[in-house]
Each structure stands twice: as structure tokens, then as C-alpha cells.
């Protein structure tokens, strides 16, 4: 199972990538194994923990659709979910985000030895003219590919 965030490649310039675990409940995990996930408007934030001097990473707006065979009365599909990272990783990410004005964006979700992992990328948002340029470049590359055949 591998789910990618195609919109992130279009909206952001993706840089360094990080693998993180994610805290899910049972029905969410089954739904994630089934591929019922939407990552289009999701992002990650690093916030202070309730423990003094520590940080926590959270993913926001990650939409995991309800599992069909579970009790979904009080289920919130867009709730914030905790990411599992070491404190050294969190501190280095936070300094990079502050100094270079970057954001953490989820780019993929996959399984690794039975555990669900989320791939995050340090990214900078593209402006509208940069998006247009990338579309033009893709079109030109496609035309060149067709012409060479």
C-alpha cells in the first residue's frame, strides 16, 4: 500500500524528506491499509509538548475516511494526529523551518514492516506564476517526447 499526495508536488517545491510514524486507532488503521486517505490539504506542525522543553509533531487535515465495518458515530475524519519522531529530528526540523521559512507537507503514506509510515517533505510554497511555468515545461516535454517517436 502506497498513497501519494500528487497535489503537493504541484503546490510546493519539495526538499528534504523524512519518514515518521503516525498514531492511529484501530478503525483508522484498517481504513488506511485499504487506501481510503486524502492528503490534499494536509500539513504538519511542530508544537511544544506538555512535558517541559520537549516538542511534538502533529499532522493536520489528513482525511482518513471512516472504515465501513466500524462504529462511526463519533468519528472525526480530519482530526489532528500525532507523528512519531525523535526529539533530535524535531529540533533540526524546527530550526530548518524557521530559518528557511519552510513547511512540512505529507507526500506519501505507506507500510513498512507492518507499520503505517508517513513521508513528510520540507517544502516551500510555489507562487501562481511558478505553477504556470511548471505546466508549460511539462507540456513542452510531452511535445518533444511525441516528436521524437
Predicted regions mapped to residue ranges:
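Ribosome-associated RNA-binding proteins
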Residues: 1-149
Amino acid at each position: 500500500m502506497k498513497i501519494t499526495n500528487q497535489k503537493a508536488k504541484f503546490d510546493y517545491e519539495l526538499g528534504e524528506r523524512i519518514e515518521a510514524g503516525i498514531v492511529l486507532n484501530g478503525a483508522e488503521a484498517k481504513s488506511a491499509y485499504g487506501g481510503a486517505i486524502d492528503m490534499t490539504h494536509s500539513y504538519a506542525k511542530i508544537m511544544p509538548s506538555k512535558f517541559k522543553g520537549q516538542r511534538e509533531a502533529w499532522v493536520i487535515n489528513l482525511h482518513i475516511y471512516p472504515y465501513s465495518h466500524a462504529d462511526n458515530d463519533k468519528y472525526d475524519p480530519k482530526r489532528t494526529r500525532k507523528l512519531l519522531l525523535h526529539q533530535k529530528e524535531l529540533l533540526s526540523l524546527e530550526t530548518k523551518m524557521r530559518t528557511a521559512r519552510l513547511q512540512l507537507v505529507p507526500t506519501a503514506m505507506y507500510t513498512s514492516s507492518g507499520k503505517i509510515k508517513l513521508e513528510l517533505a520540507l517544502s516551500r510554497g510555489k507562487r501562481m506564476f511558478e505553477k504556470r511555468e511548471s505546466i508549460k515545461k511539462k507540456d513542452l516535454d510531452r511535445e518533444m517526447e511525441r516528436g521524437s517517436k
